[in-house]
Amino acid sequence: MSDTLTRLAQVLEERKDAAADSSYVASLYHKGLNKILEKVGEESVETIIAAKDAAISGDCSDVIYETADLWFHTLVMLAQLGQHPQAVLDELDRRFGLSGHAEKASRPSA
């Protein structure tokens, strides 16, 4: 895992037990999963809009910024659920060399 992800995962874990007024992340944890999911949704929409704008303008700076926000809030969500970013990286590794069609077919039906 990248050093940045490792450091971020460590900080996110530390903030779980911090006072709500001590940091933005601690305040999200104290507000609960629904607030965190709201932020993930908000950042998803902002990332989509930034990508559409980048396709027109050729300037990807906003899409990079918004993607960082989306990843960040997704990592907060995973931490809230007791999951580590390594679990996502492991899943991506598992999919390497596997056709997208084969991967989709291997999923249990919902």
Swiss-Prot record:
Pathway: Amino-acid biosynthesis; L-histidine biosynthesis; L-histidine from 5-phospho-alpha-D-ribose 1-diphosphate: step 2/9. Its EC number is 3.6.1.31. One of its GO terms (cellular component) is cytoplasm. GO terms for biological process: L-histidine biosynthetic process. It is found in: Cytoplasm. It is an enzyme of class 3 (hydrolase). Signal peptide: none annotated. Keywords: Amino-acid biosynthesis, ATP-binding, Cytoplasm, Histidine biosynthesis, Hydrolase, Nucleotide-binding. It catalyses: 1-(5-phospho-beta-D-ribosyl)-ATP + H2O = 1-(5-phospho-beta-D-ribosyl)-5'-AMP + diphosphate + H(+). One of its GO terms (molecular function) is phosphoribosyl-ATP diphosphatase activity. It comes from the Bacteria. The keyword Hydrolase applies. HAMAP family: HisE. Belongs to the PRA-PH family. NCBIfam families: histidine_hisI (TIGR03188), PRK00400.1-3 (NF001611). This is Phosphoribosyl-ATP pyrophosphatase. It comes from Pseudomonas fluorescens (strain ATCC BAA-477 / NRRL B-23932 / Pf-5). The gene is hisE.
